[in-house]
Amino acid sequence: MKKNITRRDFINGTQVAIGTAVAAASTTFISPWMDVFGAELANFTLNNDYYPPAENGLRGSHDGSWENMHLRVMGEEWVVDNVEEEYDLIIVGGGISGLTAAYLYRKTYPDHKILVLDNHDDFGGHAKRNEFRHGDDIRIGYGGTEAIDGPSTYPAIGRQMFEELGIELDQFYEAFEQDLYSKRGMGFSIVFDEEQFGETKHVTGYGQKSWEDFAAEAPLSDKAREDFIRVQTAEDDYLEGTPTEEKFRILQKTGYSSFLRDYVQVDEQVINIYQNWGMSFWTVDMEEVPTTSVQYYDGGIPGVDHTLPKRAGRGDEPYIFHFPDGNASIARLLVRNMIPGSFSGSTMEDIVTAKADYSMLDRSDNQLNLRLNSTVVHVVNTNQSAAVDITYVRGETAHKVRGKKCILACYNSAIPYLCPEMSEEQKAGLAHCVKIPLVYTKVLINNWEAFDKLKTSFVYYTGGFYKQAELAYPVSLGEYKRSQTPDQPMVVHMCHVPLFKDITGPEQWREGRRQILATTFEEFEQHAKDQLNQALGEAGFDADRDIEAITVNRWPHGYAYSNGLVWGEDFAEEDKPWVIGRKQFGNIHIANSDAASSATTQAAIAMAERAVKEITG
């Protein structure tokens, strides 16, 4: 029986997130400039019932968050004569890099006034929290940044910040039940598509069954079946006699698909199995992923280890340092630390279920004001180079604020349009970073019995719109408990990355951005329902009956630019475009993961530290 799926959409995002949420503040911070010009200061305090994490439908870069910046790119200008407020520091971007910058700056200047501006209706940037209600139960998912990946690789300041915020990494060893699915006999499975394999077939037990048994069930030709078993079991060195360093140089510029085709010499069907394997990690197909990189991934990709000794991998530390909402909890801990009254509690456990009071974020008596729904459109050094004037748009109204210093913790590609006075060389360095589009769709199902019956916790699709359907990480922290048994609700993670067979390099990401912005919620929804039915229908799953809600986290500007693909250029350190782009520009400093060309939380933190040190010395 078909039922309506919850999907309160942000089609008119500014009406929902701004028009009904802005309430008058009880008091206001008046700049001295207001006495001069006699203008009335706008009020930005949000209502008590404002709560974006509970919204379903299109999230991520939701409608209302991107349109004004796109107008700026097309040449639109907003002229505001009067400076409404003054701050010691203004930060553009309320993601982890921007919030970390505020946190570190306050260590040196605890009494300074800080304003953080963000174009989204929630803070955290790509660290997005998704909440679902199922009766009295709450299920939480991550809509973006997933985990503290490899905490030992974090800069010292990041590990220190975690400690100060109360993040005790050792607790994850108990909180993350690593064997929950495996002890039920659940593992990895593959849905083979008809176009490439002649029939649509879901084969379970990848890595659990013998390779011979798995291959026997897979819809492969005799030659492909033989080659599949060989690539999984052979201990051949496909570059025998070549020195190790030379092997590394060769394979660093050899895509994994080419390695399978030219060195292992497998049937094309075997290549097709793995062509999209790491799509959610690298966001390109395996023709563009260096063979050296698949060893780091540690994701069941065969054939390399006996040719090239493994140097490092994600498995050097377990992948367990995960809050139920991903790294959104880091952003929430930062906000709780800096804005009194924004959250209750004091620990890493209670932050998971604490409800943010958004009415506290932008009060006039705050030392730090976090202003959402505010798209910055112009940033300029001014006042005889002693300050920075910033124009931003909120709803249909433009405002101007002044800061002694400014940190841009936004997308690199936006900065040349925000700061047209920059040199062409610096603009080119910033524009080099083409962010990578992707979509994280979260599906709340009322039970996961079909997954359990099929003994799969992760479904990989060789074809199809979504690359995977994966059960939530089994994490229990504080009062939040993971789904205990298959008859309980579960959040399923699905990932879509636009893929173009005839486009490579950054141009595929530009085209992908256009594509996902043009895709409706209904299309994202239908693909999710069709693919879950395809994989789980044989075990009794019915999408119309079993899906409770869908949240689509659409990120047209997702991962930071990756230079580590086979076509990546080799630069001297000082010639790297992102290094040139992040140089201090008067009183304007740059902090974001783009500035390190690395889509990681540790990069976001490191670049925040660098930008703050430029200010504090």
Predicted regions mapped to residue ranges:
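Glycine-rich active-site loop/strand segments that organize a redox cofactor
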Residues: 46-48, 54, 125-156, 292-313
